[in-house]
């Protein structure tokens, strides 16, 4: 099969110009399509609920980057960033375009990624499903008008065909599912999965390649700003509390998941929020709950015949989600950018129950923990994970970072130094014992610790260095029991704590070996007990 760029462009143009390709539909128009096509149901909250079928999380083993001459030397190839050759990609790409050409209806959205005008990525999103198009409209940055959208000449195109199933033997994939990113052809090709999060994380992966090439830090974090203009960043993997902790009624939200940090400060990459919805309640998370209204999408929640939503029901997945435009939250920064950060919070959900609830890191420790990215995989964010497992995810988001980790770590270290940023490690996981024995650290206490940190009250507080990890733990924090600040005190069996802690330290050391000599200086100064 012979393919070329001309044919590819012609096919895309043909799809866009089809009479039944619906361009830049309003939320109401998309709602009508979703309901008419039986793609979702209307809930009493006003949001639509859609099912993603058997794929209720990302499929990281089915994600590939096309190995192309101008880009291949920059990508950190391995289990996460898997290569696929250009010819294989193009054959599959054209099969998908031909498949979409035969569909009765398609949905097209044009918008942006990145709220910084200098590095903004112009996007076209072509969807097989109406609810996926509403997802794109909610999650990416929306043009001011349909007229503006018509003038967008995309830097990148998402082609999403969830009902197209690949044949691994013929198409060179690992399963029926595929997420393929080509920097040369400027396309993200998605098929075989209805999980809408693949679109947003695909563009995030693209930005994580493009921004550092311009000496701009890209980050898997949430961000907010206080009344005095003080900015806080929250790093962490899905389920560690980024969205929850940054949705603070006393601080304005910059964004909940993906950001850049350039010479002017911090900017949001997205135009929406993608919050975990399991066990969501108005009492615990009022901002998120109130954002789930007309225009929002719920994924895989259980909806009764009367339209009521049971957020506690996990029969389909633990990874239930809500996708809504950022302006569904009242106190946001417009546009979604702010000054340089004063405080960085690294969030981890420690299933061992030995990491302190909060500790202050020096720059070397910050680099070490950023590269380590320790947390526990929480149920539902990836297929096959049903209970927490300890894991290391470089940069607190390894699945989304195509360049070598030291590229991001070096940028972060330079920025911490340049702007005198305070960095804290916060454990939102377990205390008093490992998962199954101990208990989850109270969200109330975590909020109190985080609030004290970002207010600057912990900057010059009294600290004690714990004997196990060598971390600096605050001696006291207002309205937080002293007994939980040093984790050994929360364990009834101190010897079991020491055994568990030593096991974790060894896991950190073993994990860090993969970085080799490039990061020896960070390991020497930043690792535990240094």
Curated annotation (Swiss-Prot):
One of its GO terms (biological process) is gluconeogenesis. InterPro entries: PEP_carboxykinase_ATP, PEP_carboxykinase_C, PEP_carboxykinase_N, PEPCK_ATP_CS. Binds 1 Mn(2+) ion per subunit. Transmembrane segments: none annotated. ATP binds at residues 201, 220, 236-244, 285, 321, 440-441, 446. Pathway: Carbohydrate biosynthesis; gluconeogenesis. It is found in: Cytoplasm. Keywords: ATP-binding, Cytoplasm, Decarboxylase, Gluconeogenesis, Lyase, Manganese, Metal-binding, Nucleotide-binding. GO terms for cellular component: cytosol. Mn(2+) binds at residues 201, 220, 257. It comes from the Bacteria. It holds the Pfam family PEPCK_ATP. Its cofactor is Mn(2+). SUPFAM superfamilies: PEP carboxykinase N-terminal domain, PEP carboxykinase-like. CDD domains: PEPCK_ATP (cd00484). Its EC number is 4.1.1.49. Substrate binds at residues 58, 195, 201, 321. Signal peptide: none annotated. Belongs to the phosphoenolpyruvate carboxykinase (ATP) family. HAMAP family: PEPCK_ATP. This is Phosphoenolpyruvate carboxykinase (ATP). It comes from Staphylococcus aureus (strain MRSA252). The lineage of its organism: Bacteria, Bacillati, Bacillota, Bacilli, Bacillales.
């Amino acid at each position: 099969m012979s393919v070329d760029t001309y044919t590819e462009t012609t096919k895309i143009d043909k799809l866009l110009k089809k009479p039944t390709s619906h361009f830049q539909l309003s939320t109401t128009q998309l709602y009508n399509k979703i309901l008419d096509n039986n793609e979702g149901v209307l809930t009493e909250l006003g949001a639509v609920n859609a099912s993603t079928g058997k794929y209720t999380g990302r499929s990281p083993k089915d994600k590939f980057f096309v190995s192309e001459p101008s880009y291949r030397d920059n990508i950190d190839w391995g289990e996460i960033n898997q290569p696929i050759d250009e010819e294989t990609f193009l054959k599959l790409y054209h099969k998908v375009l031909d498949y979409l050409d035969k569909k009765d209806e398609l949905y097209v959205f044009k918008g942006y990624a990145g709220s910084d005008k200098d590095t903004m990525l112009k996007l076209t999103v072509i969807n097989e499903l109406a609810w996926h198009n509403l997802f794109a409209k909610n999650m990416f940055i929306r043009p001011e008008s349909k007229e503006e959208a018509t003038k967008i000449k995309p830097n990148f195109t998402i082609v999403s065909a969830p009902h197209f199933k690949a044949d691994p033997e013929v198409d060179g994939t690992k399963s029926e599912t595929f997420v393929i990113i080509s920097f040369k052809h400027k396309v993200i090709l998605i098929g075989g999965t209805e999980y809408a999060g693949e679109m947003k994380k695909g563009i995030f992966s693209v930005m994580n390649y493009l921004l550092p090439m311009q000496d701009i830090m890209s980050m898997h974090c949430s961000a907010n700003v206080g009344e005095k203009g003080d900015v806080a960043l929250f790093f962490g993997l899905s389920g560690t509390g980024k969205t929850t902790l940054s949705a603070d009624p006393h601080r304005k939200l910059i964004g909940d998941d993906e950001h850049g940090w350039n010479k002017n400060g911090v900017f949001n990459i997205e135009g929406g929020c993608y919050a975990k919805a399991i066990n969501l309640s108005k009492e615990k998370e009022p901002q998120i709950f109130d954002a789930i209204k007309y225009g929002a999408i719920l994924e895989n929640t259980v909806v009764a015949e009367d339209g009521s939503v049971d957020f506690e029901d996990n029969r389909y997945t633990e990874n239930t989600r809500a996708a809504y435009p950022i302006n569904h939250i009242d106190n946001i920064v417009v546009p979604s950018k702010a000054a340089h950060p004063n405080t960085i919070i690294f969030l981890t959900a420690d299933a061992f129950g030995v990491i302190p609830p909060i500790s202050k890191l020096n720059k070397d420790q910050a680099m070490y923990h950023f590269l380590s990215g320790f947390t526990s995989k929480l149920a539902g964010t990836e297929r096959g994970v049903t209970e927490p497992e300890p894991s290391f995810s470089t940069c607190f988001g390894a699945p989304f970072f195509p360049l070598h980790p030291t590229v991001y770590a070096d940028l972060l270290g330079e920025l911490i130094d340049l702007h005198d940023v305070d960095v804290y490690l916060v454990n939102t996981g377990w205390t008093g014992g490992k998962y199954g024995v101990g208990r989850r650290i109270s969200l109330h206490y975590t909020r109190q610790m985080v609030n004290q940190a970002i207010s600057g009250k912990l900057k010059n507080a009294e600290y004690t260095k714990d004997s196990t990890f060598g971390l600096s733990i605050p001696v006291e924090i207002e309205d937080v029991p002293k007994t939980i600040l040093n984790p050994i005190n929360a364990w009834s069996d101190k010897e079991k704590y020491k055994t568990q802690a030593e096991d974790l330290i060894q896991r950190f050391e073993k994990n860090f070996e993969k970085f080799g000599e490039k990061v020896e200086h960070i390991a020497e100064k930043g690792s535990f007990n240094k």
